[in-house]
Regions:
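Active-site scaffold of zinc-dependent metalloenzymes
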Residues: 1-57, 71-72, 80-93
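Active-site recognition of the HExxH zinc-binding catalytic motif
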Residues: 59-71
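A glycine-rich, hydrophobic loop/mini-helix early in the fold
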Residues: 77
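Short, Lys/Arg-rich amphipathic alpha-helical interaction segments
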Residues: 97-102
């Protein structure tokens, strides 16, 4: 799926495996602004996984999309807070609630 992020076309790839994307061995998703891709891991139930993986996958996707917005806005290269995972998590987690206000 392709999305427009501040005028840049990003490709979102879901259900990706560690075999195709080795970074998924460490992360459930990542954003690569050098090739405008957002990669989301294939979420599989296990004894250690969260119960609602659909909810979690959406949260991971929002997290990576926010990284892409910060990157495309230029803030990634000019500000430490734009790379701060806690800030990105905050917006990814709270965005659905914020959207209701707008």
């Amino acid at each position: 799926m392709d999305v427009d992020i501040l005028g840049a076309k990003y490709t979102i790839v879901k259900d990706c495996t560690k075999d195709k994307e080795p970074l998924l061995a460490e992360f459930d998703g990542f954003m690569d602004d050098t090739v405008n891709k957002i990669i989301i891991a294939k979420m599989e139930h296990s004894d250690e996984s969260l119960k609602d993986l659909n909810f979690y996958e959406k949260q991971v996707l929002r997290h990576e999309v926010i990284h892409a917005f910060l990157s495309e806005s230029g803030l990634k290269s000019n500000s430490d807070w734009a790379r701060n995972e806690e800030m990105v998590d905050y917006f990814a987690i709270q965005f659905p609630k914020m959207l209701k206000v707008f």
